[in-house]
Amino acid sequence: MSGGKPRGLNAARKLRNNRREQRWSDLHYKKRALGTAFKSSPFGGSSHAKGIVLEKVGVEAKQPNSAIRKCVRVQLIKNGKKVTAFVPNDGCLNFVDENDEVLLAGFGRKGKAKGDIPGVRFKVVKVSGVGLLALWKEKKEKPRS
């Protein structure tokens, strides 16, 4: 009955090699070791990114909810990739116009979508250099250009 791991005095190499091979099954290790966060994610490993608004879109919520979530299509300045970003709060889509410069941040769980919004991994934080929350609370006004 041979089961389990080797336990002898001279088993260190076997244990080390085994552990090294098994680590590749761990998704977090694999992503870190291969550097895929920098290669594949639109933000390139950073927490925020600036972009230009291309259009406003409504994304339908997943079942069992029924709503149209207000989002914008944004082209990132740093690499030209196009992403969809959620615009939080009631009526905040009115502050965002096409060709505005927006600051995006992550939204949801470790690069996955949040809640009932399919495929939307980012949210709008600032519009034309002014915080979206400040605009919404009417503490600041959007600069007229």
Curated annotation (Swiss-Prot):
Gene Ontology MF: a single term: structural constituent of ribosome
Superkingdom as given in the UniProt entry: Eukaryota
Keywords: Cytoplasm, Hydroxylation, Ribonucleoprotein, Ribosomal protein
Hydroxyproline: residues bearing it: 64
GO biological process: translation
Disordered, as annotated region: 1-23
Compartments, as annotated in UniProt: Cytoplasm
CDD domains, sorted: Ribosomal_S23
GO cellular component: cytosolic small ribosomal subunit; ribosome
Pfam family, one: Ribosom_S12_S23
Tagged with keyword Ribosomal protein: yes
InterPro entries recorded: NA-bd_OB-fold, Ribosomal_uS12, Ribosomal_uS12_euk/arc
Subunit structure: Component of the small ribosomal subunit (SSU). Mature N.crassa ribosomes consist of a small (40S) and a large (60S) subunit. The 40S small subunit contains 1 molecule of ribosomal RNA (18S rRNA) and at least 32 different proteins. The large 60S subunit contains 3 rRNA molecules (26S, 5.8S and 5S rRNA) and at least 42 different proteins.
Function according to Swiss-Prot or TrEMBL: Component of the ribosome, a large ribonucleoprotein complex responsible for the synthesis of proteins in the cell. The small ribosomal subunit (SSU) binds messenger RNAs (mRNAs) and translates the encoded message by selecting cognate aminoacyl-transfer RNA (tRNA) molecules. The large subunit (LSU) contains the ribosomal catalytic site termed the peptidyl transferase center (PTC), which catalyzes the formation of peptide bonds, thereby polymerizing the amino acids delivered by tRNAs into a polypeptide chain.
Recorded family membership: Belongs to the universal ribosomal protein uS12 family.
Name of the protein this chain belongs to: Small ribosomal subunit protein uS12
Organism: Neurospora crassa (strain ATCC 24698 / 74-OR23-1A / CBS 708.71 / DSM 1257 / FGSC 987)
Designated gene of the protein: crp-28
